[in-house]
Amino acid sequence: MGQITIRLPFPVSINEMYVNRAGPGRSRYPSPVFKAWTTEAGLLLNTQRPPRIGYRVTIHIDLDDRRQGDADSRIKCVLDILVKHGILVDDRKKFVKRTSIGWEPVEGCVVRIERATDE
């Protein structure tokens, strides 16, 4: 398999993904910002039709370098949408050997997925 390239909107930070419910106990639920991002990302994935990947991969995530924030806080959002839409079976180490993330001159977010090599 060659490399699979997927375009996504700029991912939300892990700090923006969930909000705490008021009241007794500690209940978390998806934030409106995360729900909106998930909807937009899902629509983009549906138009790109990436294949389902059932083997171990390395994932490279390129973020729009005109944006601000911590790159590492955006990995979970990207992996979760890939699993939710069935592109990845799971994001456990059995299926995802390595992730890398950085800032590049791209629009939104570009995800490159390739078969992991044994080292």
Language model regions located:
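Acidic, proline/glycine-enriched N-terminal capping motif
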Residues: 1-119
